[in-house]
Amino acid sequence: MAAASVTSPGSLELLQPGFSKTLLGTRLEAKYLCSACKNILRRPFQAQCGHRYCSFCLTSILSSGPQNCAACVYEGLYEEGISILESSSAFPDNAARREVESLPAVCPNDGCTWKGTLKEYESCHEGLCPFLLTECPACKGLVRLSEKEHHTEQECPKRSLSCQHCRAPCSHVDLEVHYEVCPKFPLTCDGCGKKKIPRETFQDHVRACSKCRVLCRFHTVGCSEMVETENLQDHELQRLREHLALLLSSFLEAQASPGTLNQVGPELLQRCQILEQKIATFENIVCVLNREVERVAVTAEACSRQHRLDQDKIEALSNKVQQLERSIGLKDLAMADLEQKVSELEVSTYDGVFIWKISDFTRKRQEAVAGRTPAIFSPAFYTSRYGYKMCLRVYLNGDGTGRGTHLSLFFVVMKGPNDALLQWPFNQKVTLMLLDHNNREHVIDAFRPDVTSSSFQRPVSDMNIASGCPLFCPVSKMEAKNSYVRDDAIFIKAIVDLTGL
């Protein structure tokens, strides 16, 4: 893997775990998955044990201090002192990030046809897809982002409204229930047909309306007819004999039990007086409450308007925060790229000779055998300050015909800032060496580029296809003679012939 400076995971923290697996439009490879959340890596960090984690996941794990790597434990690869997750030894895996961000992606939201790369999805589409399902804060239902405003204003059953009659605040779902008790709700008189009579004055209208049907005054003694107010006198004249008969019958019944009447009469009179006093008191209270209800309704309407304004402000601020978070995330990525470039510049050479030290050889070899990190790229080096840009690629467990038996070493022509000034195809002799620490038996291989190969044409992407030696050095030779591996490190040297440049 390309060398990188060790940076705290917190510096790239975007408070988001890995990408959903449903984003990939191609078959998913295990190397792209976070060892913690098992989703696609987002801002990958590599621990010293070789496992990769999302920046968010690693920060969450390390929030309570250094931890054992659960992936090492699960895979049976735990090593004391190596399988430890800690901020000081984890570093941003920019090579893995570039691979992940270049993967083809499709939007997982139903109905959306967007396609692109993971990098484009994160920067331009994630969180902005019109088909994204979001939760309505009022009714808790799921609505598409593009329909959220219409839902909030027109369809949400919990949307805040004001009664059109009394202006009291009310949700849409409770509006019909409110109409049943609203003091300003318009009623229609069945007698005269007058409409839009407020409920609070309807009884006064009924008492005054000549067309309203009321009980006959003699209903207490047995007359059950309902008569219009204006015809009440005619009814009493027409039913005079019947009313007198009812009165006589009632009188005779009362006369038959005078003791009971004498006992009940004063008690009923007293109760009536008490009830009349209470009614008068309650009427005064109702008047006060009506005025208070009107005042509260006006206040509630003002609060409702202010609430809507506040909600609009909150939504606008929330959008700004999201934009700022996205902007900070992009700046963090740019900063990581700059850190990577500075780190590479510190070890770059400009004379065509490059010595690459690979530390932690034992661990990196185990990772290559396990398939977690099969290849490692060196920092870039140059033939001159304005010359060709190159790097090395090594497979510690071999590649192709050398897999499992040899160390494979390749030479890579990279896209440089001055390619337009250089001669193409690249045609300089390349010598590759595995250095013997005793300076006696260096493993050496050299080749002159095949100018017809695409590996040595002017690069159109970050780097050309690697070319070199899949059978560079047998693993058995390295293990049998400890002069190649010393202090758990090996040194690889590349020499580019500058003749003709």
UniProtKB/Swiss-Prot annotation:
Control of this protein's activity: Has very low E3 ubiquitin ligase activity in the absence of sphingosine-1-phosphate. E3 ubiquitin ligase activity is strongly activated by cytoplasmic sphingosine-1-phosphate.
Keyword Ubl conjugation applies: yes
InterPro entries the UniProt entry points to: MATH/TRAF_dom, TNF_rcpt-assoc_TRAF_met, TRAF-like, TRAF1-6_MATH_dom, TRAF2_MATH, TRAF2_RING-HC, TRAF2_Znf, TRAF_BIRC3-bd
EC number(s) stated in the UniProt entry for this protein: 2.3.2.27
Phenotype seen when the gene is deleted: Important embryonic and perinatal mortality. Life-born mutants appear normal at birth, but are smaller than their littermates after three days, fail to thrive, and few survive more than three weeks. Thymus and spleen are severely atrophic, and mice display lymphopenia of both T and B lymphocytes, with normal erythrocyte counts. Their thymocytes are abnormally sensitive to TNF-induced cell death and exhibit high levels of spontaneous apoptosis. Macrophages are highly sensitive to TNF and produce high levels of nitric oxide (NO) in response to TNF.
Stored Pfam families: TRAF-mep_MATH, TRAF2_zf, TRAF_BIRC3_bd, zf-C3HC4, zf-TRAF
Annotated region (Important for interaction with BIRC2 and BIRC3), positions in chain: 283-293
Tissue expression pattern: Isoform 1 and isoform 2 are expressed in spleen, adipose tissues, skeletal muscles, thymus, testis, heart, lung, brain. Isoform 2 is very weakly expressed in heart, lung and brain.
Effect of residue 292 to A: Almost abolishes interaction with BIRC2
Any GO molecular function: ubiquitin protein ligase activity
UniProt main location, coarse: cytoplasm
Modified residues (Phosphothreonine): 7, 22, 117
Keyword Acetylation appears in the UniProt entry: yes
Enzyme class: transferase
Subunit structure: Homotrimer. Heterotrimer with TRAF1. Heterotrimer with TRAF3 (via TRAF domain). The domain containing the RING-type and the first TRAF-type zinc finger can also form homodimers (in vitro). Interacts with TNFRSF1B/TNFR2. Interacts with TNFRSF5/CD40. Interacts with TNFRSF4, TNFRSF7/CD27, TNFRSF8/CD30, TNFRSF9/CD137, TNFRSF11A/RANK, TNFRSF13B/TACI, TNFRSF14, TNFRSF16/NGFR, TNFRSF17/BCMA, TNFRSF18/AITR, TNFRSF19/TROY, TNFRSF19L/RELT and EDAR. Stimulation of TNF-alpha receptor TNFRSF1A leads to the formation of two distinct signaling complexes.
Protein purpose: E3 ubiquitin-protein ligase that regulates activation of NF-kappa-B and JNK and plays a central role in the regulation of cell survival and apoptosis. Catalyzes 'Lys-63'-linked ubiquitination of target proteins, such as BIRC3, IKBKE, MLST8, RIPK1 and TICAM1. Is an essential constituent of several E3 ubiquitin-protein ligase complexes, where it promotes the ubiquitination of target proteins by bringing them into contact with other E3 ubiquitin ligases.
Family to which the UniProt record says this protein belongs: Belongs to the TNF receptor-associated factor family. A subfamily.
The name this protein goes by in its record: TNF receptor-associated factor 2
